[in-house]
Amino acid sequence: PISDQQTPQSDVMQMDHSQHHQLATEPQPVVQQKQSSSDGTDHASHIKEHGGQVYQQTIFESKWLRNEDGEGILKSEFETRIGTDENKVFIKIHADQAESQQAEYDAKLLYSRMLSDFWDVQAGLRYLNNQNREVDQEQVGAVVGIHGLTPYFFETDAYLFVGQDQQVSFTLETERDVLLTQKLIFKPYLDINVIFSDDSNYAKKSSLSTTQLGLETRYEINKKVMPFVDVAYGYNKGSEETAWQQHSSSKNERLYGGGIRFKF
């Protein structure tokens, strides 16, 4: 190793000194490249410090709930988000399938812009699909809302929807994790749906349409796999009578079941 280090040094000693002026006046790309590389590293660090780092998260959840009459429903949710702290894109898909019926789908594509450290404003499109209906199986509307944390760290989504046939509605979803241990966690939650107007062929009654208040208890096998049990109280005001559906009365029910959630 010593001789290897000495060899290039002896070559330098034998260099023709008449070349010094030429070397001094020629461009030095290696030095410039190092400076450019250093500037790029500093710029990347600056972006990360100011919320410019791109990240992605996907959550999939599926649960089976049953009411007091033994009627069951499979509820599945898929959510993925990608972007920076300031700008993100959300894709949210909800699927509900009652026993002996086709699934109902609710999909949203949202652009999310940071308002503050705890709140984003979101806007986008909503797509509904219900193959149980004879007409109006597919509908598209606009959505605007907010996503973030309230005081006491309740994660909250609040959206206003405007769709076909003068359908205007509002939804609120809020939840919070309460740690019992590092792996056993309570999650109280509240889901509310308010109908302001609905002139569709399958109109729902206006004002408070549905409510679900529940408590989820989950066990985190790890940060990616989380089975849970769920108990809840549900309220449904019912539907208006139209040419395509019969009038239905309000309904209160207790729900219980379980499911599993994946994060990756």
Placement of each model-derived feature along the sequence:
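Outer-membrane beta-barrel initiation region
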Residues: I2-Q101, R113, Q131
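Hydrophobic, lipid-facing positions within transmembrane beta-strands of outer-membrane proteins
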Residues: Q56-T58, L74-F78, Y105-L109, V140-V144, ...
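Transmembrane beta-strand segments that form the barrel wall of outer-membrane beta-barrel proteins
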Residues: Q57-R66, N87-A98, W119-Q131, F153-Q164, ...
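Solvent-exposed loop/turn segments connecting transmembrane beta-strands
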Residues: L65-L74, D96-Y105, L128-V140, F161-T171, ...
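Residue-level signature of outer-membrane beta-barrel architecture
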Residues: I82-T84, R113, G148, V162, ...
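Repeated loop/turn-to-beta-strand initiation elements of outer-membrane beta-barrel proteins
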Residues: D85-I91, D117-V121, Y152-T156, T181-F186, ...
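Detector for outer-membrane/organellar transmembrane beta-barrel domains
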Residues: Q137-D199
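Outer-membrane beta-barrel "beta-signal"
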Residues: E220, S250-F264
